[in-house]
């Protein structure tokens, strides 16, 4: 059943919903050099340090993202399609060394051997082998897109940790285990060999003991369902990977033939929060994509006539809670944090009111210049932090129209409807100054100490450009204030918080970010900021071309 957006004028008095107004940007600089193929730098390069890196900051910042966008005459169409390039910034007693390597995935090796695109990616359909005859090329179109031999293992999105080992992942069945010292692939792991899922997100969550949780999906005789996955924290045998993984809950898709696309989920101490949003995957289009000569991305569409639903799962029992929470249509790619208070789950998200972002990230759009680039940017949805409240214990006797949230510190509301559902209106966690920064994405917190707990700060990238924006931002979610770092002509990556030894303060440490530029006469660098005042402590300059990447992690020595 498709639930259409209702109007609740009588409830809006207590929960003002301000509409963001954005200025039109003009004269955006071309960033095409940040989205072109680069050479790997497998031998360590000593960086030139300006300022200083704290002596206690010892370890490696690992990042990944696309770094090769063509093979022979074949070119990728979408930013997400590029071959995974692994980056390592190694810090030791104030010195910094950089290296990079292309992930030797089966996809990378197959494409390299044929010097063409052999395996399809998110936005690029691999063409039939020109060496085959006409009949063979025709029949090759009838291979199912999920067939293991034809599915990409180009895991270019994030580093994740299971049982103490690190894996590169995307959103398919496959992960690639890597040696974090050498950046070499050591093993390919298929989720479907352990549990009945067709993939998992690149953003798992972790309990303090190392137990990992993730979201996957599967399609069976009863339709499409979303799966909550749990992976134990420790190995029984040394050679294990994700052995012991379990599906602890299945959530039926609201619309069987068109489930939601999702990139992440929320977690508190006791609950998993899954957001079913109206960014839909048309299963028929995806299943027939190769026959129709279309890429996987052709099967994803924004359907704003549908609302966004919140599903809450008890981590201990695996039970889906009976509460039915929904809101106006929005899209979220990254959750900020979630916690419990006074019988409610509070979840903070980076939200967009338009779900066409995936279309914007076609490489032909990102590489534009002049008015064409301005038009693409001005038409793109901007992402802003919002808070939602989900009351867990809803009385059947609660009157229709009551706001069930008991929380005095947030204007987010949860209003009971006549049919027992709960309409959730958000609180904006920002003022107008964040609109001037183009919104925010790639949110990060002091995860080890504050994930699943009430918190004060998060860090992210401002988006006054299509790729990476031009700033790093510290957001105070209590006072709704910002601290901003910016340098003209440079584009910082996702900020990574590293705590100082012995600290329990949310901002008691430093922020690391890889900052790159399209200007050939300038060096890219690793930036270190004081997380409290957001002032620069130092930078480590590397005379190597780097593309803009996605996610990463810091691993202390």
Swiss-Prot record:
EC no.?
1.13.11.-, 1.13.11.71
What broad taxonomic lineage does this protein's source fall under?
Eukaryota, Metazoa, Chordata, Craniata, Vertebrata
Q: Where does this protein hold Fe cation?
A: 203, 263, 334, 551
Q: Please tell me where this protein is predominantly located.
A: mitochondrion
The cofactors required by this protein are: Fe(2+)
- Domain of life of the organism in this record? Eukaryota
What protein family is recorded?
A: Belongs to the carotenoid oxygenase family.
Q: Which reaction does it catalyse?
A: all-trans-beta-carotene + O2 = beta-ionone + all-trans-10'-apo-beta-carotenal; 5-cis-lycopene + O2 = 5-cis-10'-apo-lycopenal + (3E,5E)-6,10-dimethylundeca-3,5,9-trien-2-one; 13-cis-lycopene + O2 = 13-cis-10'-apo-lycopenal + (3E,5E)-6,10-dimethylundeca-3,5,9-trien-2-one; lutein + O2 = (3R,6R)-hydroxy-alpha-ionone + (3R)-3-hydroxy-10'-apo-beta-carotenal
Summary of the function given for this chain in its UniProt record: Broad specificity mitochondrial dioxygenase that mediates the asymmetric oxidative cleavage of carotenoids. Cleaves carotenes (pure hydrocarbon carotenoids) such as all-trans-beta-carotene and lycopene as well as xanthophylls (oxygenated carotenoids) such as zeaxanthin, lutein and beta-cryptoxanthin at both the 9,10 and the 9',10' carbon-carbon double bond. Through its function in carotenoids metabolism regulates oxidative stress and the production of important signaling molecules.
Q: Which UniProt keywords apply?
A: Dioxygenase, Iron, Lipid metabolism, Metal-binding, Mitochondrion, Oxidoreductase
Listed under GO biological process in this entry are:
carotene catabolic process; lutein catabolic process; lycopene catabolic process; retinal metabolic process; xanthophyll catabolic process; zeaxanthin catabolic process
Instruction: Indicate yes or no for the key word Protease.
Output: no
Q: Which InterPro entries match?
A: Carotenoid_Oase
Molecular-function GO terms, alphabetical: 9,10 (9', 10')-carotenoid-cleaving dioxygenase activity; beta,beta-carotene-9',10'-cleaving oxygenase activity; beta-carotene 15,15'-dioxygenase activity; metal ion binding
Its subcellular locations are: Mitochondrion
Cofactor note from UniProt? Binds 1 Fe(2+) ion per subunit.
What is the designated name of this protein?
Carotenoid-cleaving dioxygenase, mitochondrial
Gene Ontology cellular-component terms for this entry are: mitochondrion
């Amino acid at each position: 059943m498709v639930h259409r957006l209702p109007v609740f004028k009588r409830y809006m008095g207590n929960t003002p919903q301000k509409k963001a107004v954005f200025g039109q940007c003009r004269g955006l600089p071309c960033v095409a050099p940040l989205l072109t193929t680069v050479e790997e730098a497998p031998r360590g390069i000593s960086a030139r340090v300006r300022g200083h890196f704290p002596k206690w900051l010892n370890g490696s910042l690992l990042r990944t993202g696309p770094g090769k966008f063509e093979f022979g005459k074949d070119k990728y169409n979408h930013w997400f399609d590029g071959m995974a390039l692994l980056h390592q910034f190694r810090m030791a007693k104030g010195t910094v060394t950089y290296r990079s390597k292309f992930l030797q995935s089966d996809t990378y090796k197959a494409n390299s051997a044929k010097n063409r695109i052999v395996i399809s990616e998110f936005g690029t359909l691999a063409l039939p082998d020109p060496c085959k005859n006409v009949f063979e090329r025709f029949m090759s179109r009838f291979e199912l897109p999920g067939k293991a031999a034809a599915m990409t293992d180009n895991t270019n999105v994030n580093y994740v940790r299971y049982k103490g080992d690190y894996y590169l992942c995307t959103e398919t069945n496959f992960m690639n285990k890597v040696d974090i010292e050498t950046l070499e692939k050591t093993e390919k792991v298929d989720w479907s060999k352990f549990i009945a899922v067709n993939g998992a997100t690149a953003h798992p969550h972790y309990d303090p003991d190392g137990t990992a949780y993730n979201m996957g999906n599967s399609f069976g005789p009863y339709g499409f369902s979303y799966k909550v996955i749990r992976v134990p924290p420790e190995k029984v045998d040394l050679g294990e990977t994700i052995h012991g993984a379990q599906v602890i809950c299945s959530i039926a898709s609201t619309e069987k033939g068109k489930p939601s696309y999702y990139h992440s989920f929320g977690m508190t101490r006791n609950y998993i929060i899954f957001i079913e949003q109206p960014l839909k995957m048309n299963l028929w289009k995806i299943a027939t994509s190769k026959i129709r000569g279309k890429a996987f991305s052709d099967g994803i569409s924004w359907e704003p006539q549908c609302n966004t639903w919140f599903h809450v799962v008890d981590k201990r029992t695996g039970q889906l809670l009976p509460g039915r929470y929904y809101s106006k249509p929005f899209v979220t790619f990254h959750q900020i944090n979630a916690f419990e208070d006074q019988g409610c789950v509070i979840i903070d998200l980076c939200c967009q009111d338009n779900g066409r972002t995936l279309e914007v990230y076609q490489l032909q759009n990102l590489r534009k210049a002049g008015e064409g680039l301005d038009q693409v940017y001005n038409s793109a949805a901007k992402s802003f932090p919002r808070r939602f409240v989900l009351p867990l214990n809803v009385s059947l006797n609660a009157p229709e129209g009551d706001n069930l949230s008991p929380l005095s510190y947030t204007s987010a509301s949860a209003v009971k409807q006549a049919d027992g559902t709960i309409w959730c209106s958000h609180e904006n966690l920002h003022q107008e100054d964040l609109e001037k920064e183009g919104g925010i994405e790639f949110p990060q917190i002091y995860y080890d100490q504050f994930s699943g707990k009430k918190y004060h700060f998060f860090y992210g990238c401002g988006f006054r450009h299509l790729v990476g924006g031009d700033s790093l931002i510290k957001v105070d979610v209590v006072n709704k204030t910002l601290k901003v770092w910016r340098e003209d002509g440079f584009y910082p990556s996702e900020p990574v918080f590293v705590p100082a030894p012995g600290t329990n303060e949310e901002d008691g440490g430093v922020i690391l970010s890889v900052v790159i530029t399209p200007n050939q006469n300038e060096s890219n660098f690793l930036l270190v900021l004081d997380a409290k005042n957001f002032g620069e402590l130092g930078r480590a300059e590397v005379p190597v071309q780097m593309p803009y990447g996605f996610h990463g992690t810091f691993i202390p020595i």
